[in-house]
């Protein structure tokens, strides 16, 4: 079970007891997702449905995912995102993923990148500054990860 809330700045947050997904449209066709906590699958397809709606609205999407606050993720969630990324390649211009300093998250994302067969469409960042620079290049302003 989870709650969905639209924040005053227009961001949308999906929140459960253990995890949150915050979606922020940085500009049309550019979406930032911040995931914090331990994702046990309580959101079902809701996160992917949100991203899919953005892709339909803007035709293509540059997708930034900040996973530096992730503590854990169950296999079915990882597998669902891997398959979703594989199937949605045509609508995704680029995917930037910030894993932060977690070896677990970096390894998990690296495996998912290979299994999704997306090639260099997915860029993995371990340094928050590099991630912020990638956002700035796309958006045109300086953005800082949480």
Residues covered by each model-derived region:
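Amphipathic, Lys/Arg-enriched alpha-helical "gate/interface" segment within cytosolic domains
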Residues: 1-146
């Amino acid at each position: 079970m989870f709650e969905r809330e639209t924040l005053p700045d227009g961001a949308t947050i999906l929140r459960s007891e253990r995890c949150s997904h915050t979606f922020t449209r940085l500009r049309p066709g550019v979406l930032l997702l911040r995931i914090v906590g331990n994702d046990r699958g309580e959101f079902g397809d809701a996160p992917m449905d949100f991203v899919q709606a953005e892709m339909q609205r803007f035709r293509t999407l540059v997708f930034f995912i900040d996973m530096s606050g992730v503590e854990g993720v169950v296999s079915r969630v990882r597998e669902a995102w891997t398959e979703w990324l594989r199937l949605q390649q045509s609508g995704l211009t680029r995917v930037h993923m910030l894993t932060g300093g977690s070896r677990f998250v970096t390894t998990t994302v690296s495996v998912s990148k290979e299994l999704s067969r997306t090639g260099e469409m997915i860029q993995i960042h371990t340094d928050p500054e590099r991630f912020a620079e990638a956002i700035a290049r796309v958006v045109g302003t300086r953005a800082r990860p949480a």
